């Protein structure tokens, strides 16, 4: 995509005494209700590609920075009572497209810049640390969905039908698959090179 429109992906456009100036877009989960975001590089194929070095940037960004625009989808919560919409009101998560229009990032907030090997490393290892809380959260969402499905089936009397029981059992299997991944990540955990 950067060949089609070089300003589409987040990249550095200039360097100043105060910091770096960035332009482009980046998705960040929870940016809509955060004070700051850990902005990471997007591109995956960094290996020795110096043409992409302007895209090899990571920093902490204030969500109210001048030139930063937030484009969010509408939330599902608040469209009705918690009793009528338990999933939407309890498990909604808003992803945000951040559009950086010449945003100044102070040097003290820059984690790395024009460092393709750091960008490759962070893209390769990031999910090692973010997957655990994600899977933990998804397990609770699965519990809520199974509960809602079972409640609905019992209220309508459909829980007596074999086909419905099979679907409920399949939901339970999916939930247990999530739990198995979480359990394995704990049981098979290894220290990272940085000691985490």
Task: Label each PLM-derived region with a short phrase.
Residues 1-23:
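Gly/Pro-rich turn-and-neighbor structural signature
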Residues 10-11, 28, 49-50, 87-91:
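Short Gly/Pro-enriched turn/cap motifs at secondary-structure boundaries
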Residues 11, 72-75, 82-89:
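Short Gly/Thr-rich strand-loop-strand
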Residues 16, 33, 55, 92-99:
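A generic structural signal for well-ordered coil/turn residues at beta-strand boundaries
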Residues 19, 36-38, 58-60, 97-102:
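Conserved hydrophobic/aromatic beta-strand scaffold that supports enzyme active sites
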Residues 25, 29-80:
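A short core secondary-structure module
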Residues 81-175:
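Glycine-rich beta->alpha junctions and the first turn(s) of the following alpha-helix
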Residues 179-196:
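C-terminal helix-coil-helix/basic helical segment that borders enzyme active sites and/or dimer interfaces
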């Amino acid at each position: 995509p950067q060949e089609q429109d070089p300003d589409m992906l987040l990249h550095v456009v200039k360097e100043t005494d105060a910091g770096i100036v960035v332009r482009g877009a980046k998705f960040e989960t929870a940016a809509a209700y955060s004070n700051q975001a850990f902005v990471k590089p997007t591109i995956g194929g960094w290996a020795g590609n110096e043409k992409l070095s302007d895209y090899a940037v990571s920093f902490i960004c204030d969500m109210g920075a001048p030139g930063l625009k937030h484009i969010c989808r509408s939330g599902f919560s608040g469209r009705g009572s918690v009793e009528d919409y338990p999933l939407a009101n309890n498990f909604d998560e808003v992803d945000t497209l951040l559009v950086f229009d010449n945003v100044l990032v102070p040097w003290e907030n820059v984690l790395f810049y024009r460092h393709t090997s750091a960008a490759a490393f962070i893209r390769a290892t990031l999910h090692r640390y973010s997957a655990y809380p994600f899977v933990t959260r998804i397990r609770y969402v699965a519990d809520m969905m199974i509960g809602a499905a079972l409640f609905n089936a019992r209220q309508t009397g459909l829980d007596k039908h074999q086909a419905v029981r099979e679907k409920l059992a399949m939901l339970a299997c999916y939930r247990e698959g999530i739990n198995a991944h979480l359990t394995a990540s704990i049981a098979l955990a290894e220290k990272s090179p940085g000691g985490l």
